[in-house]
């Protein structure tokens, strides 16, 4: 930490970065406190929640290209948009990021973090394993509402299930395989399109062949 800036490696948990911000009385990173994942992943997909996004707090990112070249990219050149960035588009490897925040009241910062945590506990299926929000929000719609309107609340493929608590989440009820989760997502995408004409796009990233 240097003045209002936090320097963190790509492997740093977002919760740890948020805790550091709180301990230094820095505000602006509260939205990310409950997002499960690391700083590198958050930078790559411009992670966000509750009105906040990484593009609002990033100053610069150090990356490595496929050719082994090291680059420092300022936020203005990151191409940060809804769940994407130049890092993703060019498949760069994030090494480190500089977060620029503002001085704030630590009590107020903690209050906001606690409030957002309560919202997550109340509205999201945190009692089950999941990869978080499964589908991107289509423009003008909410993915969870489209899934619910298609009659898919609680829909299952093996141990993979559309959460009954929040239809925007696909959960693992115990022993779901990647194949089951992918099949569930495919069926959800198809059924939602049949019902509403809207084709959902996965927010989670697929790694490997399916």
Q: What is the predicted function of each stretch?
A:
Residues 1-3, 43, 92-96:
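Acidic/polar active-site rim loop that often engages polyanionic ligands
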Residues 20-26, 45-56:
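A glycine- and small-aliphatic-rich helix-loop capping segment at beta-alpha/alpha-beta transitions
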Residues 27, 57, 76-78:
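Short beta-strand or tight-loop elements
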Residues 15, 45-47, 76-82:
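Short acidic (Asp/Glu) patches
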Residues 64-186, 190-210:
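Phosphate/pyrophosphate- and phosphate-bearing ligand-binding catalytic cores of soluble enzymes
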Residues 59-63:
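Short polybasic amphipathic segments
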């Amino acid at each position: 930490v240097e003045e209002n800036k936090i320097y963190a490696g790509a492997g740093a948990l977002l919760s740890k970065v948020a805790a550091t911000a709180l301990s230094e009385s820095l505000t602006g990173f509260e939205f990310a406190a409950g997002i499960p994942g690391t700083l590198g992943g958050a930078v790559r997909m411009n992670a966000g929640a509750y009105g906040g996004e990484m593009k609002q707090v990033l100053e610069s990112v150090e990356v490595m290209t496929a050719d082994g070249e090291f680059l420092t990219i300022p936020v203005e050149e990151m191409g940060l948009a809804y769940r994407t960035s130049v890092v993703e588009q060019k498949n760069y490897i994030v090494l480190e990021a500089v977060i620029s925040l503002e001085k704030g009241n630590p009590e107020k910062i903690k209050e906001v973090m606690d409030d957002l945590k309560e919202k997550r506990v109340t509205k999201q299926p945190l009692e089950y394993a999941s990869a978080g929000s499964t589908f991107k929000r289509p423009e003008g719609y909410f993915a969870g509402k489209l899934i619910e309107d298609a009659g898919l609340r609680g829909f299952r493929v093996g141990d993979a299930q559309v959460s009954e608590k929040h239809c925007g989440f696909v959960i693992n009820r115990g022993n779901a395989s990647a194949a089951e989760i992918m099949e569930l997502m495919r069926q959800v995408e198809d059924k939602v399109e049949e019902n509403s004409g809207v084709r959902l796009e996965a927010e989670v990233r697929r790694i490997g062949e399916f």
